[in-house]
């Protein structure tokens, strides 16, 4: 039932949708991956994140090989229905590099320029 309600609000007309994954406790953005309808269904059904790998052309469950699972706490849908925000309880690292977040490289701007 939950899946059907979510699907009614989604627009998969372009095939894949971006899925932003965020830590439910502290709001940190952990990663971005892509989902199709089946990946979203698996995510809702199992309460763990599933994605579609564009390079391998197959489904993958975050944590299946590493043990670094993402347990779904909530799913938000953007205004156009073509992007979702998944808030999770992250176990271990979210990034394949071993970093907690895939966004571990950043630039800070001061007075209009990067420092």
UniProtKB/Swiss-Prot annotation:
Q: Which residues bind Mg(2+)?
A: 78, 80, 82
Family according to the record: Belongs to the PRA-CH family.
What is a GO molecular function of this protein?
A: magnesium ion binding
Q: What class of enzyme is it?
A: hydrolase
Q: How is the cofactor bound?
A: Binds 1 Mg(2+) ion per subunit.
Compartments annotated for it: namely:
Cytoplasm
Tell me which InterPro entries the record gives.
PRA-CH, PRib_AMP_CycHydrolase_dom, PRib_AMP_CycHydrolase_sf
Supply one GO CC term from the record. cytoplasm
The protein's name: Phosphoribosyl-AMP cyclohydrolase
Per UniProt, the keywords (alphabetical) are: Amino-acid biosynthesis, Cytoplasm, Histidine biosynthesis, Hydrolase, Magnesium, Metal-binding, Zinc
Gene from which the chain derives: hisI
Taxonomic classification: Bacteria, Bacillati, Bacillota, Clostridia, Eubacteriales
* Pathway where this protein functions: Amino-acid biosynthesis; L-histidine biosynthesis; L-histidine from 5-phospho-alpha-D-ribose 1-diphosphate: step 3/9
- Main function: Catalyzes the hydrolysis of the adenine ring of phosphoribosyl-AMP.
Q: Name one Pfam family in it.
A: PRA-CH
Q: Which residues bind Zn(2+)?
A: 79, 95, 102
Specify the domain of life of the species encoding this protein: Bacteria
Q: What is its EC number?
A: 3.5.4.19
Q: Which GO terms describe its biological process?
A: L-histidine biosynthetic process
Could you tell me which PANTHER family the record lists for this protein? HISTIDINE BIOSYNTHESIS BIFUNCTIONAL PROTEIN, HISTIDINE BIOSYNTHESIS BIFUNCTIONAL PROTEIN HIS7
């Amino acid at each position: 039932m939950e899946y059907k309600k979510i699907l009614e609000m989604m627009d998969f007309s372009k095939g894949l949708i971006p899925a932003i994954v965020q830590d439910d406790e502290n709001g940190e953005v952990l990663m971005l991956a892509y989902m199709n309808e089946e990946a979203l269904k698996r995510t809702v059904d199992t309460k763990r994140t599933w994605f579609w790998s564009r390079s391998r052309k197959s489904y993958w469950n975050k944590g299946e090989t590493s043990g670094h699972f993402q347990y779904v706490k909530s799913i938000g849908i953007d205004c156009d229905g073509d992007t979702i925000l998944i808030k999770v309880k992250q176990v271990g690292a979210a990034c394949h590099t071993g970093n907690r977040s895939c966004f571990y490289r950043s630039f800070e701007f001061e007075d209009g320029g990067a420092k």
